[in-house]
């Protein structure tokens, strides 16, 4: 693949196993000339074990209209909502608290997300998770 020229990089967040040609996937890939159904089938096959998880994906489109994609870990906010069983964070995070995140949960989320974060220490990743939790109206132990 080193001889192929990259013409476009597309970043999307798609629920695992639920890629389809409807917006926003179809228009983004169609504008780049990518086979939309080919991408949807490959993505759904790769994410069939993670249904419903919101997965960031980086799609690289090459000059011959082929593509490759890299999946990342779900966003921290999504992991926090899943850990606490929430639909959404607080509308007023300073006043209305929607849950409490234990230290063990923070560490587990930080360990899972650490490969996508630009940090070396687990403690730094934990602080980033804590900050996201606070901005969502979740108390941190």
From Swiss-Prot:
InterPro entries: Ribosomal_uL11, Ribosomal_uL11_bac-typ, Ribosomal_uL11_C, Ribosomal_uL11_C_sf, Ribosomal_uL11_CS, Ribosomal_uL11_N, Ribosomal_uL11_N_sf. Keywords: Methylation, Ribonucleoprotein, Ribosomal protein, RNA-binding, rRNA-binding. One or more lysine residues are methylated. One of its GO terms (biological process) is translation. One of its GO terms (cellular component) is cytosolic large ribosomal subunit. One of its GO terms (molecular function) is structural constituent of ribosome. It holds the Pfam family Ribosomal_L11. SMART domains: RL11 (SM00649). SUPFAM superfamilies: Ribosomal L11/L12e N-terminal domain, Ribosomal protein L11, C-terminal domain. Forms part of the ribosomal stalk which helps the ribosome interact with GTP-bound translation factors. Belongs to the universal ribosomal protein uL11 family. Part of the ribosomal stalk of the 50S ribosomal subunit. Interacts with L10 and the large rRNA to form the base of the stalk. L10 forms an elongated spine to which L12 dimers bind in a sequential fashion forming a multimeric L10(L12)X complex. This is Large ribosomal subunit protein uL11. It comes from Chlamydia muridarum (strain MoPn / Nigg).
């Amino acid at each position: 693949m080193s001889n192929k020229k990259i013409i476009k990089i597309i970043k999307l967040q798609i629920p695992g196993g639920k890629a389809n040609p409807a917006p926003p996937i179809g228009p983004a890939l169609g504008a780049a000339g990518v086979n939309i159904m080919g991408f949807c089938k490959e993505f759904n096959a790769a994410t069939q074990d993670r249904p419903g998880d919101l997965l960031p994906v980086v799609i690289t489109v090459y000059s011959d209209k082929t593509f490759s994609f890299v999946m990342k870990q779900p966003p921290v906010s999504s992991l926090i909502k899943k850990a606490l069983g929430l639909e959404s964070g607080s509308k007023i995070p300073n006043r209305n608290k929607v849950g409490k995140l234990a230290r063990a949960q923070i560490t587990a989320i930080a360990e899972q997300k650490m490969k996508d974060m630009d940090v070396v220490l687990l403690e730094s990743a934990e602080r980033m998770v804590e900050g996201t939790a606070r901005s969502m109206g979740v108390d941190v132990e």
